[in-house]
Curated annotation (Swiss-Prot):
Family membership: Belongs to the heat shock protein 70 family.
Induction remark: By stress conditions e.g. heat shock.
Source organism (scientific name): Rhodopseudomonas sp. (strain No.7)
NCBIfam families recorded: PRK00290.1, PRK05183.1, prok_dnaK
InterPro entries: ATPase_NBD (IPR043129), Chaperone_DnaK (IPR012725), Heat_shock_70_CS (IPR018181), HSP70_C_sf (IPR029048), HSP70_peptide-bd_sf (IPR029047), Hsp_70_fam (IPR013126)
Membrane spanning stretches: none
Function field: Acts as a chaperone.
Location of the region described as Disordered in the Swiss-Prot/TrEMBL record: 517-536
Keyword Protease: no
UniProt keyword annotation of Chaperone present: yes
Record-given protein name: Chaperone protein DnaK
Keywords linked to the UniProt accession: ATP-binding, Chaperone, Nucleotide-binding, Phosphoprotein, Stress response
Sites bearing Phosphothreonine, chain numbering: T198
GO molecular function, one term: ATP binding
């Protein structure tokens, strides 16, 4: 069995790790970095860039550079959060035929699962390069507060990337695994995870290799991206006051502002003041304009204070659901890049009444936990049991649009629960089961996961038929629902596929596209290699022809020059086969030139050798005594 890798598919950065002996190890990517920006770009000529190369060209290609796409995964186009995101990103968010939010570049649409798959492919390649073997199985992390549609979409992303996703694991739970595996500690810990796009808090009990999640809460639209945008808006407002130009209307300027904001935010975690300097940010009739501004940590903290405060309520709810007080938490573990911000650490300290634990790398700990879970599933890590929970209540819509819970939030998974319902009208022969996830009392206020019909119910007065609805949640937190008429034994079930979501045929098409793209990438690489080889051949042949062309006859010289000309022409295009063919023709034609060069070298060598022989003979001539005397 091949290695199973652990992947932290983050909003801003992603990370891959693998078990190495008894411990998990983070794998460096081709650029030598331990994390990879979760950014995908499409270039002018249709080439796809992932990670650092995509981030580097974002300023000059803002409309085709997709970042923070994780915030769109599993979301409908009309979701208020998507509406909010549309005004903040330079790329196009469009409505897919199934009603989901997708992204678009050059008229081609991509589902968030597809874009995430490009990032997962990069992580897969990183692991394969390190391990020297093919990798096709993974454990992938998601925010604990992700709903069913978002989990399913993440699993789809894995499939598109050519990975069998053995388990979807919650990010705070993965972090707790990494934190607690080597420690003999027992106790109750809180994992405070503020990342690039999402916030989670989980309360866990750890002891004797058992990691039991007691409760979880969070906000899937709160993270570093929001802190960046707060700063972007502040910089744009200040510039508009001064110059009368709104930089947000210029996509190129907006991307430069975003990069500067992210850099300033990071710097202000370790320094109390930073300078933002963006020359030639825009221009008007009077000439070019520059943006230069000093920003203090205090000002930045004031700008984002409400965002930091938004993390407090989920923490209180998680404590309440776990039946604990802050004083009963033995350790608070910080996860996610945003927890490096001093203000965040201060709020956590005030809330839990203790200094948070900073002994884990907030950018890598989740991937390490995923690799440990991969080790557990592979049988390499023994005596570890992970008991996670479902983050949101699950139920169905009943008479009057009421949301009737069947499984409450923070129920340990996997789990299975049933409840019996009946008909609302006399002689009703079919019922529609509408499945929802959330905490509101009315079904319409919650997230609808899907619906299905149970047909063929025998005619009976209302309230008589007995319909048993069963919810089954697997270890990935993905839901299956079935409904059974107890009188006839007729059963109908669905694996919940969000009312949007990707169909199996769409996933298969995207898998094929990904494979075709891999083939396309290989072709592109082969073309580059062929060009490099041909360039070198042209250069060496021209040099040899200039130096030794006089030693071959005119016909041979002409055929070399013709082959050179053909290859130069082929090099103007991208046809790898044509370049290879013309390279071979030139190599064949140049053989006579090579022979002439070798003949000359041999002749020169023989003459030199003859000269050497004379010298040697002279040196070792013996002279007898008689000759010496006569001399």
């Amino acid at each position: 069995m091949g290695k199973v890798i652990g992947i932290d598919l983050g909003t801003t950065n992603s990370c891959v790790a693998v078990m190495d002996g008894k411990s998990a190890k983070v794998i460096e990517n081709a650029e030598g970095m331990r994390t990879t920006p979760s950014i995908v770009a499409i270039t002018d000529d249709g080439e796809r860039l992932v990670g650092q190369p995509a981030k580097r060209q974002a300023v000059t290609n803002p409309e085709r550079t997709f970042f923070a796409v994780k915030r769109l995964i599993g979301r409908r186009y009309d979701d208020p959060m998507v509406e909010k995101d549309k005004g903040l990103v330079p790329y196009k968010i469009v409505k897919a035929s199934n009603g989901d939010a997708w992204v678009e570049a050059d008229g081609k649409t991509y589902s968030p699962s597809q874009v995430s798959a490009f990032i997962l492919q990069k992580m897969k390649e990183t692991a394969e390069a390190h391990l020297g073997q093919k990798v096709d199985q993974a454990v992938i992390t998601v925010p604990a507060y992700f709903n069913d549609a978002q989990r399913q979409a993440t699993k789809d992303a894995g499939k598109i990337a050519g990975l069998e996703v053995l388990r979807i694991i919650n990010e705070p739970t993965a972090a707790a695994l990494a934190y607690g595996l080597d420690k003999a500690k027992t106790g109750t810990i809180a994992v405070y995870d503020l990342g690039g796009g999402t916030f989670d808090v989980s309360i866990l009990e750890i002891g004797d290799g058992v990691f039991e999640v007691k409760s979880t809460n969070g906000d899937t639209f709160l993270g570093g991206e929001d802190f960046d945008m707060r700063l972007v808006n502040y910089l744009a407002d200040e510039f508009q006051k001064e110059q009368g130009i709104d930089l947000r209307k210029d996509k190129l300027a907006l991307q430069r502002l975003k990069e500067a904001a992210e850099k300033a935010k990071i710097e202000l975690s370790s320094t109390t003041q930073t300078e933002i300097n963006l020359p030639f940010i825009t221009a008007d009739q009077s000439g070019p304009k520059h943006l230069t501004m000093k920003l203090t940590r205090a000002k930045f903290e004031a700008l984002v204070d409400d965002l930091v405060q938004k993390t407090i309520e989920p923490c209180r709810k998680a404590l309440k659901d776990a039946g604990l007080t802050a004083g009963e938490i033995s350790e608070v573990v910080l996860v996610g890049g945003m927890t490096r911000m001093p203000k965040v650490q201060e709020v956590v300290k005030q809330l839990f009444g203790k200094e948070p634990h900073k002994g884990v790398n907030p950018d890598e700990v989740v991937a390490i936990g995923a690799a440990i879970q991969a080790g557990v599933l592979q049988g390499d890590v023994k005596d570890v049991l992970l008991l996670d929970v479902t983050p949101l209540s699950l139920g169905i819509e009943t008479l009057g649009g009421v949301f009737t819970r069947i499984i409450d939030r923070n129920t340990t998974i996997p789990t299975k629960k049933s409840q019996v319902f009946s008909t609302a009208e006399d002689n009703q022969n079919a019922v529609t089961i509408r499945v929802f996830q959330g905490e509101r009392e009315m079904a319409a206020d919650n997230k609808m996961l899907g619906q299905f019909d149970l047909m063929g119910i025998p005619p009976a007065p209302r309230g008589m038929p007995q319909i048993e609805v069963t919810f089954d949640i697997d270890a990935n937190g993905i839901v299956n629902v079935s409904a059974k008429d107890k009188a006839t034994g007729k059963e109908q079930q669905i694996r919940i596929q969000a009312s949007g979501g990707l169909s199996d045929s769409e996933i298969d098409k995207m898998v094929k596209d990904a494979e075709a793209n891999a083939a396309e990438d290989k072709k592109r690489r082969e073309a580059v290699d062929a060009k490099n080889h041909a360039d070198a051949l042209v250069h060496s042949t021209e040099k040899a022809l200039a130096e030794h062309g006089s030693k071959i006859d005119e016909g041979e010289r002409r055929s070399i020059e013709d082959a050179l000309s053909d290859l130069r022409e082929a090099l103007k295009g991208d046809d790898a086969e044509a370049i290879k063919t013309k390279s071979n023709t030139l190599a064949q034609a140049s053989m006579k030139l090579g022979e002439a060069m070798y003949k000359q070298a041999e002749a020169g060598g023989a003459a030199q050798q003859a000269g050497k022989d004379d010298v040697v003979d002279a040196e070792f001539t013996e002279v007898d005594d008689d000759k010496k005397k006569s001399a």
